[in-house]
From Swiss-Prot:
Species classification: Bacteria, Pseudomonadati, Pseudomonadota, Gammaproteobacteria, Pasteurellales
Species in which this protein is naturally found: Haemophilus influenzae (strain 86-028NP)
Recorded name of the encoding gene: ispE
Protein name as catalogued: 4-diphosphocytidyl-2-C-methyl-D-erythritol kinase
Domain of life: Bacteria
Catalytic activity annotation: 4-CDP-2-C-methyl-D-erythritol + ATP = 4-CDP-2-C-methyl-D-erythritol 2-phosphate + ADP + H(+)
Family: Belongs to the GHMP kinase family. IspE subfamily.
Entry's EC annotation: 2.7.1.148
Keyword Cytoplasm included in the entry's annotation: no
TM region positions: none
Residues that bind ATP: 113-123
Xref: HAMAP family: IspE
Active site: residue positions: 29, 155
Broad enzyme group: transferase
Amino acid sequence: MKSHQFSTALCQNTTQSNGQPLRFPSPAKLNLFLYINGKLPNGYHELQTLFQFLDFGDWLDISIREQDNQIVLTPEIPNLKTENNLIYRAAKLLQEKANIQLGANIHLDKILPMGGGVGGGSSNAATALVSLNYLWQANLSIDELAKLGLTLGADVPIFVYGQAAFAEGVGEKITYCEPAEKWFVILKPDDSISTAVIFQDPNLPRNTPKKSLEQLLSEPYKNDCEKVVINHYSNVEKALNWLLQYAPARLTGTGACVFAEFDHEAEAQAVFRQKPEAFFGFVAKGLNVSPLHAMLKQLSSTHTHRQSKPEVL
């Protein structure tokens, strides 16, 4: 059975036989807190939010196509044309930017829920950019990759840089940080959230005072979107209320996923075993360094080690 928890699989994933794909992690993220500080004249909202990665997510199996420059993406996603898929668009952007003549076979092993607020699509796009930059030896800097990623989505650069981060403004001001790496039970209620509906709601708080990162990290975390979301979506409210029986719990982003935090894995697993069948969910540890970057560091170390081995006579 394939593992969607990266820590158990990465150590076995740094060798590639000729023509065989490499598996690259595409992790989920949580917004550990989210505060709305104001609304700008252009309609955008000023935010303060804290991103952290999870040791859980999708995999992208990628191999180089030397015979042509085609991007072959599988499987097909219902009601989504391949050319509109963020993974495909990321690959084509990198090809054009770096003038790459090679192609790629990309298989998405999908587990993260669509529309859950855990960054699945943005993470997939970032993993495509970062991994193909490595495989194609495109040699773009991390800043160049992040700029490409920003054209695909506001959250893509966070996944490209691969470090837990505090974001301010409309998301353009980034400070890297190291919040506690706790264990989480994440539930995905059967609701599809409209972010536009949430941000247009007149009851959405829009005047939370700005605070320093140090102060925010020392206070209980909250999400300003939570009350509005549960007013619109009853299944989110049910999932959140269930988690609150056991531990502090919040919405991530605008949902639909909700999460509860624990200090130890055993506590999280014990609660998860009692999960109602109606909710998709998983247990994962928070990570301040993306598993994708951990893998690339491992790959680079392995490559350097092999190059430095003395020749056997």
